[in-house]
């Protein structure tokens, strides 16, 4: 029983039904978000019971979230729009692989769960080709199921990889010592990923009669929940620009991959005590920052400096921050647990590149970050939606940033979404021992993105962040005492 695949298809009344998507769903990055939950298996759990548990988990989850059984397809119109459709030959897919078996153990070369834990679950051991399969990116006309899960058994752990997909994108594989969830933005955003995984975790616990943690997921009309500002124009969106001919949609990087070498994903950690100290230092010259504001300002300064950006070539640096806009919406209000996308626009802070070495940087940068986050309100979302509905294509505009080779950064702010507090049940170690995320196809591609994770088990309120750059940049960060005063490198 080395490999088993099960497809959970929609019931006949659902076949042919369509979920219409809204403008923010259409503009959301068409790339994969893969989340990794590292869970430790109980010593006496059997392979048969794991298979039964994860099969039941998916079966129950798709009853609560039917859109997990949809397929992402093109609407075949001139606007390059997507939709979610219930098809009779597709659905949510679960694959179980036992990498402890004689036939498959040679394909898993990274040892036990303890070995991964000792290395802090490094990205270079999270190989997608090992942990999820079934999509050929060259098959352009093949529809992609919304949810695919692969449960990978390794010594001492289960690598459960779940992914929500989108059409015409490369298929993402993940590696982790326990569980990986993967979400594509067309299906839902980061909070939607959490809602999906919370539902899976609830059914994985297998004690629903004692469960009181149900989340009231709201399946509102995605196509109409945002009222577009039809009077908005592109000049009202300085953080967006038209896509140039031949340019890839929402890909703010320009480089020849053959010229790059030594690319790495590094994990850094800042303790709860150091976060407090950092806030104290910044508060001496300005309003006391939140932990997120302080950490974002710190990362922004030291990463840009480590990249040796030439101020004469790039006089300004931008920092984009992801924002969940649900609570900021009005007319109509958007429910806290709305299923869909409220991930655009990003908050964008700006600073002169020459200012990154000034003594006043932290006070100025913190103010810029705070102001940028506050500016992502209902009006900002409605302006973006209004421009999108007027454009000839949903893919006609892109972020007005240059993350490579330019100086701009994006921080994906997941630290306030309680992924690491999800309880998978005692057989799966309760809460995960680590949480990892990949967004898009990051292998061999520096893209100026940082991911800030929620606190790990045993870390208190300390936070891990992932940075992906070439080795020379990371080496300069590691040699920067102003950075290592706060952050330690884990992998």
Predicted features and spans:
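Non-catalytic N-terminal regions of enzymes
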Residues: 1-234, 276, 280, 291-311, ...
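Hydrophobic, mid-to-C-terminal alpha-helical segments
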Residues: 286-351
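Flexible, P/S/T/G-rich "lid" or insertion loops adjacent to the active sites of thioester-utilizing
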Residues: 230-287
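Acyl/amide activation-and-transfer machinery of modular secondary-metabolite enzymes
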Residues: 28-41, 81-108, 258-265, 325-368, ...
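Short Gly/Pro-enriched turn/cap motifs at secondary-structure boundaries
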Residues: 136-139, 257-259, 399-401
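Helical lid/core segments from catalytic subdomains that handle acyl or acyl-like groups
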Residues: 263, 340-424
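Amphipathic alpha-helical protein-protein interaction segments
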Residues: 47-51, 176, 186, 193, ...
């Amino acid at each position: 029983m080395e490999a088993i695949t099960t497809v959970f298809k929609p019931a006949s009344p659902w076949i042919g039904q369509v979920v219409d998507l809204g403008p923010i769903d259409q503009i959301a990055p068409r790339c994969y978000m893969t989340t990794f939950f590292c869970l430790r298996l109980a010593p006496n759990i059997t392979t048969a019971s794991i298979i039964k548990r994860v099969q039941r988990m998916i079966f129950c989850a798709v009853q609560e979230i039917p859109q997990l059984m949809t397929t992402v397809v093109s609407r075949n119109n001139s606007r390059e729009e997507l939709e979610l459709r219930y098809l009779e030959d597709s659905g949510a897919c679960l694959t179980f692989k036992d990498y402890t078996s004689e036939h498959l153990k040679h394909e898993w070369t990274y040892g036990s769960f303890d070995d991964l834990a000792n290395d802090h679950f490094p990205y270079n051991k999270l190989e997608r080709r090992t942990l999820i399969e079934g999509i050929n990116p060259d098959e352009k006309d093949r529809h992609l199921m919304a949810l695919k899960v692969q449960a990978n058994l390794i010594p001492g752990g289960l690598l459960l990889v779940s992914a929500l997909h989108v059409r015409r994108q490369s298929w993402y594989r993940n590696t982790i010592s326990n569980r990986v969830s993967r979400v594509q933005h067309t299906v839902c955003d980061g909070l939607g990923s959490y809602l999906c995984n919370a539902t899976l975790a609830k059914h994985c616990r297998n004690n629903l009669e004692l469960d009181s943690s149900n989340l009231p997921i709201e399946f509102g009309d995605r196509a109409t929940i945002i009222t577009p500002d039809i009077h908005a124009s592109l000049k009202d969106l300085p953080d967006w620009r038209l896509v140039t001919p031949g340019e890839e949609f929402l890909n703010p990087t320009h480089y020849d991959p053959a010229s790059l070498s030594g690319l790495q994903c590094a994990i850094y950690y800042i303790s709860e005590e150091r976060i407090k100290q950092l806030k104290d230092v910044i508060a001496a010259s300005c309003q006391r920052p939140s932990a997120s504001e302080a950490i974002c300002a710190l990362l922004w300064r030291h990463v840009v400096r480590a990249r040796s950006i030439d101020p004469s070539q790039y006089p300004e640096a931008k920092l984009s921050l992801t924002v969940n806009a649900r609570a900021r919406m009005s007319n109509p209000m958007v429910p806290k647990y709305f299923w869909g996308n409220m991930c655009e626009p990003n908050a964008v802070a700006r600073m002169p590149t020459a200012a990154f070495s000034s003594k006043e940087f932290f006070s100025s940068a913190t103010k810029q970050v705070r102001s940028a986050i506050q500016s992502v309100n209902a009006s900002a979302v409605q302006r973006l939606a209004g421009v999108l509905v007027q454009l000839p294509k949903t893919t006609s505009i892109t972020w007005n940033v240059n993350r490579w080779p330019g100086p701009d950064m994006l921080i994906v702010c997941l630290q306030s979404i309680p992924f690491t507090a999800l309880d998978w049940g005692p057989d799966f170690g309760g809460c995960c021992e680590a949480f990892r995320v990949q967004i898009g196809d990051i292998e061999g591609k520096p893209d100026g993105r940082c991911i800030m994770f929620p606190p790990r088990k045993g870390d208190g309120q300390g936070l891990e962040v992932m940075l992906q750059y070439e080795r020379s940049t990371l080496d300069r960060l590691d040699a920067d005492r102003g950075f290592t005063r706060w952050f330690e490198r884990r992998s």
